């Protein structure tokens, strides 16, 4: 799975510009992709901050520690780079690589109903957490839920029995009392 939050405008957020790097207009980018340099595979970025949108071309980039350093077309100095701080880096969802069968992007799982083997509704996937060992579904109660408890369910083969995107449902093997 890949942790990628989707948006209603057909874009997916893959990173965020955090600050400037040096004096020649480069920016530091926190990448949400795994590995982080996958973000550099996209030549054109849509930068988004609130209602503001800006199309920009990636000239080059490189990993530096836990961040990326990127040179963007038309950004030639520190002031231009500073003006881009806090912009989200987005690309069209349609440009994401196709996944193998049984693999999903996080944005595809968010909002799905979670039911147990008996069909009892636990709630809907609010978001996911990356723990290192495995990803975790954060399931929040919704209308018709079994109870009002938030549940953290491991995204493992033992727990997740089936993901049905068409039906909007994830079937799990999980004790309702746990």
From Swiss-Prot:
It is found in: Cytoplasm. InterPro entries: PRC_barrel-like_sf, PRC_RimM, RimM, RimM_N, RimM_N_sf, Transl_B-barrel_sf. Gene3D superfamilies: PRC-barrel domain, RimM. Its main location: cytoplasm. The keyword Ribosomal protein does not apply. Residues 100-178 form the PRC barrel domain. Transmembrane segments: none annotated. GO terms for molecular function: ribosome binding. GO terms for cellular component: cytoplasm; ribosome. It comes from the Bacteria. GO terms for biological process: ribosomal small subunit biogenesis; rRNA processing. Keywords: Chaperone, Cytoplasm, Ribosome biogenesis, rRNA processing. The keyword Chaperone applies. HAMAP family: Ribosome_mat_RimM. An accessory protein needed during the final step in the assembly of 30S ribosomal subunit, possibly for assembly of the head region. Essential for efficient processing of 16S rRNA. May be needed both before and after RbfA during the maturation of 16S rRNA. It has affinity for free ribosomal 30S subunits but not for 70S ribosomes. The PRC barrel domain binds ribosomal protein uS19. Belongs to the RimM family. Binds ribosomal protein uS19. This is Ribosome maturation factor RimM. It comes from Azotobacter vinelandii (strain DJ / ATCC BAA-1303).
């Amino acid at each position: 799975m890949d942790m990628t939050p989707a948006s209603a405008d057909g874009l997916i957020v893959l990173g965020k510009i955090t600050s400037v790097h040096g004096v020649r207009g480069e920016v530091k980018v926190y990448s949400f992709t795994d590995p982080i340099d996958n973000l550099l595979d996209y030549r054109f970025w849509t930068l988004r901050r609130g209602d503001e949108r800006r199309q920009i071309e990636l000239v080059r980039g490189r990993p530096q520690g836990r961040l990326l350093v990127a040179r963007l077309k038309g950004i030639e100095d520190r002031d231009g780079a500073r003006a881009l701080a806090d912009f989200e880096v987005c690309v069209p969802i349609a440009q994401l690589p196709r996944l193998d069968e049984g693999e999903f992007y996080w944005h595809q799982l968010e909002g799905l109903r979670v039911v147990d083997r008996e069909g009892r509704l636990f709630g809907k996937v609010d978001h996911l957490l990356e723990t290192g060992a495995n990803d975790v579904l954060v399931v929040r109660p919704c209308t018709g839920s079994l109870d009002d408890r938030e549940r953290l369910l491991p995204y493992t083969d033992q727990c997740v029995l089936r993901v049905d995107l068409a039906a909007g449902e994830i079937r799990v093997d999980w004790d309702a009392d746990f």
